[in-house]
């Protein structure tokens, strides 16, 4: 599949940088509706040093952070939010269904459910090999 956005283009849109930029590329964008992106999880991730020795597992909160970053890209692609920053305003209904480990390819899906002025809600889901590993509802706030 052809990349819609590269890591360099992603870093031009969102402020996250190493070691907390969790998107390798964007696979698909339907403007104002949904986005799918990829994170290749490798043993070289800093968080694996302590989470957990001998049983490396990606922390659930970092999966949610990756989903929020993907949502930020979709939101900031909207004309009215160009040049702004999207922040997490809330996390609801978070569920973790299986662990994410080195070698996994994390597919990150975000769909806008509701948007009013500078506040919105998105449905966020992460998959590994078509298996749902995490889902949540993210409230976002756009500002400077």
From Swiss-Prot:
Q: Where does this protein reside within or beyond the cell?
A: Cytoplasm
SUPFAM superfamilies for this protein: Thioesterase/thiol ester dehydrase-isomerase
Entries under Pfam families matching the protein = FabA
Q: Which UniProt keywords apply?
A: Cytoplasm, Lipid A biosynthesis, Lipid biosynthesis, Lipid metabolism, Lyase
Q: Look up the domain of life of the source.
A: Bacteria
Top EC class per UniProt?
lyase
**Known catalytic reactions:** a (3R)-hydroxyacyl-[ACP] = a (2E)-enoyl-[ACP] + H2O
Gene Ontology cellular-component terms listed: cytoplasm; membrane
One GO term under biological process is: fatty acid biosynthetic process
Enzyme Commission code: 4.2.1.59
**Which Gene Ontology terms cover its molecular function?**
(3R)-hydroxyacyl-[acyl-carrier-protein] dehydratase activity
Catalytic center at which residues?
51
InterPro entries the UniProt entry points to: FabA_FabZ, FabZ, HotDog_dom_sf
Sequence similarity:
Belongs to the thioester dehydratase family. FabZ subfamily.
What NCBIfam families is this protein classified in?
fabZ (TIGR01750), PRK00006.1 (NF000582)
Q: What does this protein do?
A: Involved in unsaturated fatty acids biosynthesis. Catalyzes the dehydration of short chain beta-hydroxyacyl-ACPs and long chain saturated and unsaturated beta-hydroxyacyl-ACPs.
Which protein is depicted? 3-hydroxyacyl-[acyl-carrier-protein] dehydratase FabZ
Organism field:
Enterococcus faecalis (strain ATCC 700802 / V583)
